[in-house]
Amino acid sequence: NNLKPILKKKFNLDYTPSSAWIKLYEVMKTLPFMISKNNNIYTLSLAEAPGHFMKSIETFIHQRDIKYKTKTNYTWYANSLNPYSQIVRKRYPDFLIGDTFSLIRNYPKRWLWGKDNTGDIMNPDNIRHMKKFITDNNIKLDLVTSDAGLAGDDLFDLQKLEYAQAIGTIYLCSPNKHVVIKHFTPIIFEIKDSIDSTGYFVSLMYLYALCFEKIYFTKPNSSNKKSGEFYLVGYKKKDV
């Protein structure tokens, strides 16, 4: 929390950066290859509303442009649970997120809600629908992010969500490009059954390893040291 006003002033932001914003910025500074040096950069962010990851990427690119006297055109696309979908309101009432930056209202064509218009990445048809949009519009994504990782005691549902974001990011990522995904370690010592989920977790990490030339595990200094939160970065997707 102490960092937020400092960063707001340092980068002359018209908003206060969130914890998610700060953590992703730190990851990008640690592994700067994530953001290519092309003149045109395209990203897709899953589970993104209200837009903290995109705002963090935007600032990172802007600061790099200032440092190297370059000019980069940044185009983002995003996915999230659709706050205007009645299905979402009934199915996920606890996960609705407001349009803090008015990015949904001002850029409706940038938001990919999928085939059923819910934005639910646990529906495979929605992932396929996003892929079709990207392919049909000849969009070459430089980076795919996902902020869907959660911690909690509902292990089976969390595993389904983590698997969905893994499949989604891998499938949507362009060959030779990168992903960054928020995850949580599976073991919660207060929950006995969580120890049994380690096999699933290792298998999920192995899936990433099969699909990328390298994978990195990083825990930002700005992340709660007592939490199992970490970020997985997939470097150069293989042609799979």
Map each language-model feature to its residues.
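An acidic- and aromatic-residue-enriched active-site/binding cleft used to recognize and process polar
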Residues: L46-G51, L81-N82, G149, F184-I188, ...
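Conserved P-loop NTPase motor core
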Residues: S45-L46, L210, K225
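Conserved Class I SAM-dependent methyltransferase catalytic core
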Residues: D154-Y216
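Short hydrophobic/aromatic beta-strand or adjacent loop that forms the aromatic wall/cage
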Residues: S227-L232
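Conserved acidic residues
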Residues: I41, D142, E213
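Conserved proline-anchored active-site loop of SAM-dependent methyltransferases
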Residues: L44-P50, F133-D154, K182
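Flexible, glycine-/basic-rich loop-and-beta segments that form/coincide
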Residues: V233-V240
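Intrinsically disordered, low-complexity glycine/charged-rich regulatory or linker segments
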Residues: N1-N137
